[in-house]
């Protein structure tokens, strides 16, 4: 169970069912496994997904959405794990269920970031149990390379502190018993495929992940159609303030102390 002080700082909406809301995912396993948990706990269905190229929807009439593993700009609801502040005084999305947003982690104090998956944060927030097997726990740590911080002497203390705050001390024991090479061997290609309006995950990789995680991975039913085209690119910290004020900004993430990955609306249908 998540540390009470940290839990109380998460937005209230993220702990309860939000009637009439649907999910927006991305094209990777961290997002889809997180959506699977939210579907199991709250019954949410996925209506949209976003890539760096565009935004796709099944039902265009649905207006209320929650991003999953998406660092949405403004005040839009999202579960996320990215650093989204370029400077210590940058605006932050108050509706982001994200440790890094809650603790005001920016590029100014980037080495203090929580470098875990969105999935781990959601599991802790909603008190979802860890996989039953050692192999399942190891695989969980490979998602979004959540294990990596432990193997840096510089980040290890921070990594361990965050794991304790999430209430997953058992995972600290797991990394102590596992080499970095072991994790690399367990890790799979986490990319999903979008083809002919459907979001899919390679059958063998899907079954492998499901067997280790202990639950079925949710995949949305229905035909996705392009709703918007994006312009995605990278820039540096010096342009962070200007970028955060851009009215066309869809999402962004600080990928290092100086680099920013961002996505802007280009064309909306």
Segments the model singles out, each with a brief description of its role:
Residues 6-10, 129-269:
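C-terminal accessory domains and tails appended to enzymatic cores
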Residues 7-60:
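N-terminal ordered "arm"
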């Amino acid at each position: 169970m998540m540390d009470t002080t940290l839990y109380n700082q998460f937005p209230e909406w993220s702990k309860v069912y939000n009637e009439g809301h649907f999910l927006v995912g991305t094209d990777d396993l961290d997002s889809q496994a997180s959506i699977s948990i939210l579907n199991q706990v709250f019954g949410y269905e996925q209506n949209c997904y976003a890539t760096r190229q565009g935004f796709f929807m099944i039902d265009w009439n649905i207006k209320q959405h929650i991003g999953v593993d998406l660092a949405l700009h403004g005040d839009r609801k999202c579960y996320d794990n990215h650093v989204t502040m370029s400077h210590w005084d940058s605006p932050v999305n108050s509706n982001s269920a994200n440790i890094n947003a809650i603790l005001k982690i920016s590029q100014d104090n980037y080495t203090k970031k929580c470098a875990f998956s969105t999935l781990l944060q959601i599991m802790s927030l909603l008190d979802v149990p860890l996989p039953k097997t050692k192999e399942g726990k190891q695989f969980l740590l490979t998602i979004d390379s959540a294990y990596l911080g432990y193997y840096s002497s510089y980040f290890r203390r921070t990594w361990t502190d965050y794991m304790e705050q999430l209430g997953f001390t058992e995972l600290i024991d797991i990394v102590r018993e596992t080499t970095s090479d072991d994790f690399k061997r367990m890790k799979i290609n986490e990319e999903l495929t979008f083809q002919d309006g459907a979001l899919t995950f390679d059958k063998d990789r899907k079954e492998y992940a499901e067997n280790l995680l202990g639950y079925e991975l949710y995949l949305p039913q229905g035909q996705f159609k392009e709703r918007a085209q994006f312009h995605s690119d990278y820039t540096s910290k010096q342009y962070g303030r200007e970028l955060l004020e851009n009215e066309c900004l869809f999402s962004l993430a600080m990928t290092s102390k100086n680099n920013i990955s961002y996505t802007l609306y280009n064309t909306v249908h």
